[in-house]
């Protein structure tokens, strides 16, 4: 992923280019056959077969528009390079994360709030996009498509054989871990050698123990991570008591393999790990439950984020044609084509199947008890995953205090310009 400092340079070039050229672009051009060309660039190369099928069906049913969907490797790098060259596609399909925030802040996206399909999206996912705005903006700039969910994967057969129940509170969770341990089975496998895996349980705990807009509140100067992340850090460290010895010696693949072989009853990771696990044990019966981070079940929140969403570029010359493409993409049958190929949770309200592995999460999904991954707000150059691993390796008495202080200081260091921008906006609003 490109560093934020690099992107700031990209944004500066973009701002200059837009002023000088009026958003010149290559999208929405007329083809030799008279059709309007609409180009979509997706950041998900793993979904290329689904998009090829969708593209083919669209083109077979539309006489006036030709749709091209590309899903290149390193799509984000390619997009940023194209933006510098003012070679804009009409629509981009990316995740709801810091890249979306940066592109939106660079004023690249058009307001699509007049698109009827906006009204069909689950409110929780629209709210996630609003919280990704550095500065509040009127309008809607992305249409969430498919979401994922992360909590704790568990071996359903092991649970059934031993009479173990899915926990709904932190006390029930630790009691269950003790019970599993006493049976001779390892409760958890972590695989923290690959630092990014540290973020999986961190995010799942954080959404239940902190407000979803914590990062924005820190930017506004209303709180600090030292004041808010203490319970998250405490419970993150508590997981070590129930995991493999020296989890920093084993990586993601090791953890998937160990869990697949029944070496641990649970694995705190997202549903995205299931294909890797099933490559080792295709017949494994896997479930996934919301991380029970709180003392009361009613306080728990499912960690769910937007895996894919569509934004219309401001440079798009034919918004009507772009809207026709979006309407087709958000047809129930089209969404199902994507879900059948890639899985996930439909962001659109409707009668879409929830994957069997996520069935325990259904009440949270259906009742919008969901919040976005906190790391979607973290600047990549801050390397929060490595910070968490370092904290967990630190056995000193003041390890947590040092970790949280560093989180605060590094946040200010890597978000200095953003914090100034947010607080200037707050002052302007106060003076208005």
Residue ranges of model-derived segments:
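Extracytoplasmic "Venus flytrap"/periplasmic binding protein-like
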Residues: 57, 61-125, 157, 161-162, ...
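Hinge/lid segment of periplasmic solute-binding proteins
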Residues: 95-150, 174, 180, 201-203, ...
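Mature extracytoplasmic/periplasmic domains
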Residues: 108-111, 261, 272-276, 308-382
